Amino acid sequence: EAAGPTTDDSDCGAEENICIGLVTDTGKVDDKSFNQAAWEGTQLAAEQVGGFAKYIETVDPKDYANNIGQFAAAKYDTIVTVGFLMGEATIEAANEYPDIDFIGVDQFQGEAVPNLAGLVFREDHAGYAAGYLAGLMTQTNKIGTALGTDTVPPVKLFGEGFKAGAIAANPEAEVTLVYHEPNNAFGDPEWGAAESRKQLDQGADVIFAAGGATGNGGLIEIAKDPGAGTTVFCIGVDIDQYFTVPQAAPCLLTSAEKKLVLGTETLVMASVAGEMEGGNFVGPTGLAPYHDTDSVVPDDVKAAVEEVLAGLADGSIDTGCPACLDN
């Protein structure tokens, strides 16, 4: 007799119950970005296996360990933690609770812990493809960025990859990389908007705004420009921001995507099936559809970008990363 779906976490320790917990990084679970995508993937997996899924929103980084510990104490089977900054707390918890599977989204594992899988992405690949598109679309040869902090490797990989791709497509292009200072790097839409506005005023006509709410502020600002979608464009990040930040639609060329929903869902499913392995799991990356700007992107540009995506996938194109993290 198959047990019915698990509907709460009062008895997660029981063999027939499946409980999956997710701890967000600082920010809300509906952040229209990272936390939200990981939570959607977790929910999809829970639905398929008849499991119970619950999240805890982290308010302050000092609460990481405590939040993870709440799920562990309730004997959850699988705990997903979101974001590079939770890496250490996740490793400590995995060592303390060897019978629980941990999935660290954006947490590269230096040495493998058997019950901890790091879901990592080649951000430099998605960034490079987006940059290549920007290099072919710019009319002013000035390309801008408004990024989270480069103290978080995935953000730096996006930025450096973007710059490398833009210059590969257009050696004349001038690419400005601007990172937010580490404090509140992903929660500062005002900075994202002001930085994007400044670069538009300096002649940039394609801007990559990447970094949670900070980047979203940039996208929304660029979309207000009278030239949005004709002479001025923006590029989003992580997930297809056409759907998460609809205000950006007028300027949005594409988004440099990490397939977070799919990656999280795949690993949670593997965990529940008892097939998850410790170490790193490389999730898929790509570019989101052109949507409203589809008609202004020439066919030869689309074809060139497809070729670049194929070259990144088969390894024939080198982005210069991850070595770029050292410069």
For every predicted segment, state its role.
Residues 1-327:
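A residue-level marker of the well-folded mature domains of exported/periplasmic proteins
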